[in-house]
């Protein structure tokens, strides 16, 4: 196992806001499922279960990195990092980035020299306290409210809803576009009903 590396550097503006406010749906999503644990699902205890309609709830796990005093600061933890002479960085192995309330986990992350965007791939998860998005690949613009994820699954914790999309794009503050998407409030592995668009 490699040595863990942590580093903190300042950056500007937001990484990813709360998800799906005003989202538009188009086409039909691929039928892939994730295990309940991968969607931050927790079953009710035996004492809680009789009073509940559903079998559990979505609960965000604790952040892996501590909050920084300056919410614009980008904190990074990884097993390996390669720096190029021009300032580019490739982070590999259990990469975690946190900025404000948003935390990104992935197997590989590429940071260009200008640090204006993050390209992440491999078992990625983005959490911001209100939502979880999992996907295969993501590009996040660090100085703008823009992001793009392919083959994503999403959860809104407080609304008890989940879905998936072949493409999820944040096009501005609280503006999202989903392609080939689904939406449901059913428990994981249960699709008694869902919207498909």
What do the PLM-derived regions correspond to, one by one?
Residues 2-28:
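Gram-negative bacterial Sec-dependent N-terminal signal peptides
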């Amino acid at each position: 196992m490699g040595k863990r590396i942590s580093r903190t550097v300042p950056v500007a503006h937001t990484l990813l806001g709360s998800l799906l406010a005003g989202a538009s749906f188009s086409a039909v999503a691929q039928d892939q499922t994730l295990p309940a644990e991968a969607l931050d699902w927790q079953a009710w205890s035996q004492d809680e279960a009789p009073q509940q309609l559903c079998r559990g709830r979505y609960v965000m796990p604790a952040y892996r990195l501590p909050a920084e005093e300056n919410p614009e600061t980008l904190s990074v933890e990884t097993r390996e990092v390669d720096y190029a002479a021009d300032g580019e960085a490739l982070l590999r192995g259990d990469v975690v980035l946190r900025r404000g309330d948003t935390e990104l986990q992935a197997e590989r992350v590429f940071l260009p020299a200008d640090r204006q965007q993050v390209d992440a791939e491999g078992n990625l998860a983005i959490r911001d306290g209100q939502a979880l998005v999992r996907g295969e690949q993501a590009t996040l613009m660090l100085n703008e409210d823009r992001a793009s994820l392919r083959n994503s699954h999403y959860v809104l914790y407080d609304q008890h809803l989940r879905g998936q999309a072949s493409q999820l794009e944040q096009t501005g503050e609280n503006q999202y576009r989903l392609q080939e998407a689904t939406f449901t409030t059913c428990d994981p592995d249960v699709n008694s009903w869902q919207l498909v668009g």
